């Protein structure tokens, strides 16, 4: 069973809230979040309610302060469990919105998009199989964006404010 524990203070101190399913608004359970323990599963955490704001991808392990999950501050207001995926991974990326322009298909990780293909930005994407993470910078750094199967006609559909993607990878379950 998937489980995540949120702590108000660093090093797993202060008020604690246990969660075992997605939650669109964590505000009533804690005011701030400075440490997290993921007991099982992969999770996406969001800085704002209703799955908005900065996104953070966490897997089984301990995160004694928000810098460990590349957090910008102590706010986590919603969370989503990433379901298991068994099978292939497949995603198409496009250099322009609405699936226009050059297209490339991927079934594996890409640590540096700038080395891999000629266009700098990803404006739209179609995820047909698996769950993926986009990162704003190469080598899986910077802002993170979770993509589940579906169509993303513009970069704001995956929560980004720009089309800049420096790397991406498949979400593998680490139980």
Swiss-Prot record:
Pfam families: Crystall. The keyword Repeat applies. One of its GO terms (molecular function) is structural constituent of eye lens. Residues 2-40, 41-83, 89-129, 130-172 form the Beta/gamma crystallin 'Greek key' domain. InterPro entries: Beta/Gamma-Crystallin, Beta/gamma_crystallin, G_crystallin-like. One of its GO terms (biological process) is lens development in camera-type eye. Residues 84-88 are annotated as: Connecting peptide. It comes from the Eukaryota. Keywords: Eye lens protein, Repeat. Monomer. PANTHER family: BETA/GAMMA CRYSTALLIN (PTHR11818), GAMMA-CRYSTALLIN-2 (PTHR11818:SF135). Crystallins are the dominant structural components of the vertebrate eye lens. Belongs to the beta/gamma-crystallin family. Has a two-domain beta-structure, folded into four very similar Greek key motifs. This is Gamma-crystallin-2. It comes from Xenopus laevis.
């Amino acid at each position: 069973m998937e489980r995540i524990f949120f702590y108000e203070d660093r090093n797993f101190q202060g008020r604690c809230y246990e969660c075992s399913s997605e939650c669109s608004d964590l505000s009533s359970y804690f005011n701030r979040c400075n440490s997290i323990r993921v007991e099982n599963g992969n999770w996406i955490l969001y800085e704002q309610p209703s799955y908005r704001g900065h996104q953070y991808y966490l897997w089984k392990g301990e995160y004694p302060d928000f810098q460990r999950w590349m957090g910008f501050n102590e706010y986590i207001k919603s969370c989503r469990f990433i379901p298991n995926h068994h099978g292939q991974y497949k995603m198409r990326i496009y250099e322009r919105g609405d699936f226009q322009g050059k297209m490339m298909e991927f079934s594996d990780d890409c640590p540096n998009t700038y080395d891999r293909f000629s266009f700098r930005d990803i404006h739209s994407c179609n995820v047909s199989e698996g769950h993926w993470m986009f990162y704003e910078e190469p080598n899986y750094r910077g802002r993170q964006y979770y993509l589940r199967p579906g169509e993303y006609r513009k970069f704001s559909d995956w929560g980004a404010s720009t089309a800049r993607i420096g790397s991406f990878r498949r979400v593998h379950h680490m139980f």
